[in-house]
Amino acid sequence: MELDSGKPLSLLTLDEIDQHEGGIIQSFRTGHTTPYPDPADWLNSEEPPPGVFVTSVEKVLNWSRHYSLWPVMFGLACCAIEMMCMAASRWDLARFGMDIFRASPRQADLMIVAGTLTWKMAPWLKRIYDQMPEPKWVLAMGACGTSGGLFRDSYSVVPGFNMVVPVDVYVPGCPPRPEALLRAIMDIHEKIDKTRIIKR
C-alpha cells in the first residue's frame, strides 16, 4: 500500500501515517454534513420520509405469500378444463404469481380441487392435503365440489369437499368460468392478507 506521494506504507513514520489518516477522516466529515432524519421526528408524523417503509413482519410475510401462491391441481372432472383454461395466456395467471402448477403437494400452498369427488377418491384428497406445508388454503371449484352437484344423492359421491378437508373459498358454477376462479383467487389473497401469523 502506498500514499499519494508514492512512498510505501512500510517506510512512513507514525506522524505521516497520522496525517494521512487525518486527511481521510476530514474529507469524510466534510462529505457528510447533513444528518439522517431522527426517527423520533417522523415516526409519530403522518408520513415517513421518502425511502423509508415502516411495517410489521407479519404484513411482509403475508404480502410475500399473497404474490407467490404455488397451486397444486386436483382436477377430477369437467371443472378441471376451466382451471386449465384459466392458466392459459388469455387470463394470465402469472400476474398473481402462480406461473406453474406444482407437481408435488409438498411444494404447494394452495390446492384447487375441481370436479366430482367419490368416496373412493376421498382418502387420496385427504392425503394430498396433509402433505401440503402450513399455511395452506383450499379452493373448491364447481357445483360438485361445493355440494355434490348433480350427483349429490349418489351413494358414491361426497356431498362437498368440506366433508374431507377444510375449504377456504367456494366457486359455484357448472363449470365455473375462469373469471369466477380468478375472483376466488383474489378472495384467497384477501384471506392471506388477514392471516395472523404471530400469536399474542
Swiss-Prot record:
Major enzyme class:
translocase
Source organism phylogeny? Bacteria, Bacillati, Chloroflexota, Dehalococcoidia, Dehalococcoidales
Q: How is the cofactor bound?
A: Binds 1 [4Fe-4S] cluster.
One Pfam family, please name it: Oxidored_q6
Entry GO MF terms: 4 iron, 4 sulfur cluster binding; iron ion binding; NADH dehydrogenase (ubiquinone) activity; NADH:ubiquinone reductase (non-electrogenic) activity; quinone binding
**What function does the entry list?**
NDH-1 shuttles electrons from NADH, via FMN and iron-sulfur (Fe-S) centers, to quinones in the respiratory chain. The immediate electron acceptor for the enzyme in this species is believed to be ubiquinone. Couples the redox reaction to proton translocation (for every two electrons transferred, four hydrogen ions are translocated across the cytoplasmic membrane), and thus conserves the redox energy in a proton gradient.
The organism is Dehalococcoides mccartyi (strain ATCC BAA-2266 / KCTC 15142 / 195) (Dehalococcoides ethenogenes (strain 195))
According to UniProt, the name of this protein is: NADH-quinone oxidoreductase subunit B
Please give the cofactor(s) recorded in the UniProt entry for this protein: [4Fe-4S] cluster
Q: How does it sit in the membrane?
A: Peripheral membrane protein
For the biological process aspect of GO, one term held by this record is: aerobic respiration
Annotated GO CC locations:
plasma membrane; respiratory chain complex I
Taxonomically, the superkingdom here is Bacteria
Keyword check for Iron, yes or no: yes
